[in-house]
């Protein structure tokens, strides 16, 4: 799922979801139920162009889920979302049957929704640790990050 939006602005939200279902040969799909999953049920007949940034992110997640991937890459996926939408986004993601690799700089989200942290430097893994282990050592995610950056200096 890209950081920027790659949606078709000239389609209505419901039509875009229907198109995606058709492209993936998904039958007997309840578009209203799908839109409700991402809190967009009230926007079914609105053009994608008129959605806010956070609404577009949620729509992108839905379209990604409809691909039934085994692995997805997310680049700052909650940009533009309010706090409630962020929580709902991560909880929806947790319900899925795929692995997510997420790029984020939001330590709070890492703390609450992630299981493992990898820090990249110059295209390689500079450090990796489970969130549980970081906390077991009495550190916050931010402290772990700053310690690793300082060591890599």
List each model region and its residues.
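Conserved H-loop
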Residues: 98-103
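Q-loop/switch helix immediately C-terminal to the Walker
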Residues: 10-23
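Catalytic Walker B motif of ABC-type/P-loop ATPase nucleotide-binding domains
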Residues: 72-75
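Conserved ABC ATPase signature
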Residues: 47-51
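A short, surface-exposed alpha-helical micro-motif characterized by mixed small hydrophobic
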Residues: 110-112
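Conserved ABC ATPase "signature" region
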Residues: 18, 28-43
């Amino acid at each position: 799922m890209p950081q920027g939006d790659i949606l078709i602005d000239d389609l209505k939200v419901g039509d875009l979801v229907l198109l995606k279902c058709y492209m993936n040969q998904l039958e007997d799909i309840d578009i209203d139920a799908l839109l409700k999953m991402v809190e967009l049920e009230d926007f079914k007949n609105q053009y994608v162009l008129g959605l806010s940034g956070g609404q577009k992110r949620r729509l992108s997640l839905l379209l990604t889920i409809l691909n039934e991937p085994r692995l997805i890459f997310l680049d700052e996926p909650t940009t533009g979302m309010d706090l409630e939408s962020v929580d709902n986004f991560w909880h929806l993601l947790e319900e899925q049957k795929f692995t997510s690799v997420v790029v984020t700089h939001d330590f709070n989200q890492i703390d609450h929704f992630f299981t493992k942290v990898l820090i990249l430097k110059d295209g390689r893994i500079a450090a990796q640790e489970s969130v549980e282990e970081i906390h077991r050592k009495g550190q916050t995610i931010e402290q772990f990050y700053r310690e690793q950056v300082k060591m890599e200096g």
